[in-house]
Amino acid sequence: MAQAAAAASQVNQIAPDPAVAFDRKVGEQYLRYAGMLARRGYVASSTGNLVMRVPHAKYPEGVCYVKCMGVSLEEMTLDDLIITDVPTGRILYGDRGTTVGHQMNREILRLRPDVNAVIHLHHDETIAFFAAGYEELKITGLTFPYLMQSYPHYLPAHINVEEDVVPIKTFIARTNCIIMKRHGFTVLGRNASECYGRTNVLVGEVKRNILAEQLAAARGTSPEYLSKEEIETMFRHGDAVMYPKAKS
């Protein structure tokens, strides 16, 4: 308990480390993905975020490039990026704080060493779909299971893992996507490209669910969704399909 309290007290503490230099190439990659998310219409406010973890010799868990509070992914510049550590949220580069959601991002990165990018967005159609009473997302197409490679984990509206990260450890090993009812979603990836692609297939699946339900209702039929067996087979073969290896 005391250790957790001590770590929490260091969140957003400005602790510049000369060993942590701002890598402009990483910053420009961050801006590229932030811009692509914004151009797709996913960015609703300053509270959505993208986090990219990069390795660092001094920090075994790497360091996080993340947007500071008060600006959106749509309007940000390189000057709005800060660098934090993973365990405590201390600001190693920059002088502005992070949003509360960065505590969730850091906990995900701490528990999932295979994950190096996290995208959190308050996506309109996702919020609306679950506000309409749907309990889970059905799968209509092949791309979602091949790329996401796990079922979404659903959090009820009364659980906010941005403010209280404790529940994350109970489910994060089994999913690459958290759907937060009345809130939005959080997507994990091994790199920024995969995380961005998974975000796109999630958004696409939400929209297809809405369209399939509307069109089927108009025709008096039921939508056709993939079966559990089909989905889980695609999960298992996801890497082979999405990232086939070159042969000599």
Say what each PLM segment does.
Residues A2-S248:
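Glycine-rich flexible loops
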